Regions:
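Membrane-embedded alpha-helical segments of integral membrane proteins
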Residues: 1-18, 226
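Sec-dependent signal peptide recognition
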Residues: 3-6, 26-30
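N-terminal nucleotide/polyanion-binding subdomain common to many enzyme families
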Residues: 4-5, 40-44
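Membrane-interface helix-boundary motifs at transmembrane edges
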Residues: 17-28
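Membrane-interface elements of multi-pass transporters and channels
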Residues: 21-22, 51-56, 240-245
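Hydrophobic membrane-insertion alpha-helices, especially the h-region
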Residues: 27-42
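A structural signal for short, hydrophobic/glycine-enriched beta-strand patches
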Residues: 42-219
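Extracytoplasmic/luminal low-complexity segments enriched in Pro/Gly and acidic/polar residues
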Residues: 205, 218, 222-253
Length: 253
């Protein structure tokens, strides 16, 4: 996404030169160079990432109650060519490990603990994220009897909507939401929209790399951060236009 913005600015430079709009051309060139340096050096992605993750930097001390649910949000699947088997993506393993860790902490409290794996077949691979992630959870010691699959959602909004529908059939008084640090703020917003009071727990923390020379890594993490910011913008726009599902009061789900 950042490269698309820079490419568009480069096209505008060409257009302004064609029409000999020298002042406009100079301004756009300055903007183009400035953005390239600020993104590549890590200054812009550092700001964007801090804005998304700062409130979730410290993981909460969960107070386990009698009926607990730990929600694991999917982040895609990957086909391994040599085995023709599907595994969680690179970005998923942190979420899975954090979920298993939270489950073990919950189990130590000798209370009811369920893991809800939310993720359908968004990539049309013929297998759902919930199925694939469940296998990893089993390997990490989470009992099959304590895993509930929500296998129809294809994005974060549907994760929240369909999981809240599922919750109406259970009596959980404590809900822990696990996702990536970059993604947890928007996830919490969506789950709150559907009436779920959740305790957000980040599985990882993404940071920019400050450098005197532009790094491709910083452009990549900028794109991740911009994707989240666009999600907030879309949510606010849809609310304004009345296109989102009706917001539920916390605890209604």
């Amino acid at each position: 996404m950042s490269f698309i913005i820079l490419l568009l600015l480069l096209v505008f430079v060409g257009v302004t030169r064609l029409f000999q709009w020298r002042k406009t051309s100079s301004f756009i060139k300055l903007l183009l160079i400035s953005l390239f340096i600020l993104i590549g050096s890590g200054l812009i992605p550092r700001y964007l990432l801090n804005d998304l993750q700062a409130n979730y930097e410290r993981k909460p001390d969960i107070q386990w109650t009698s009926h607990n649910a730990i929600i694991l949000l999917g982040a895609g699947t990957q086909l391994i060519a040599s085995t023709q088997e599907f595994e969680p993506t690179f970005f998923s393993f942190g979420r899975i490990n954090e979920t298993a860790s939270q489950y073990k902490n919950c189990a130590k409290a000798q209370t009811i603990c369920k893991v809800i794996v939310s993720g359908g077949d968004a990539q049309n691979n013929g297998v759902t994220e919930a199925e694939v992630y469940q296998q990893q959870l089993l390997r990490l010691g989470v009992p099959l009897a304590d895993i509930i699959q929500e296998s129809n959602s294809v994005n974060t909004w549907k994760n929240a909507q369909l999981t809240s529908d599922l919750m109406k059939h259970h009596q959980f008084d404590n809900i822990v939401l696990v996702s990536s640090g970059l993604h947890i703020r928007r996830s919490e917003l969506y789950f709150n929209h559907f009436g779920l009071n959740v305790v957000p727990v980040r599985a990882d923390y993404m940071a920019a790399q400050i450098s005197w020379l532009p790094l491709w890594y910083n452009f990549a993490v900028t794109d991740f951060a911009l994707h989240e910011q666009l999600g907030f913008a879309r949510y606010n726009l849809y609310n304004f236009m009345g296109w989102n599902s009706k917001r539920e009061k916390p605890g209604d789900a």
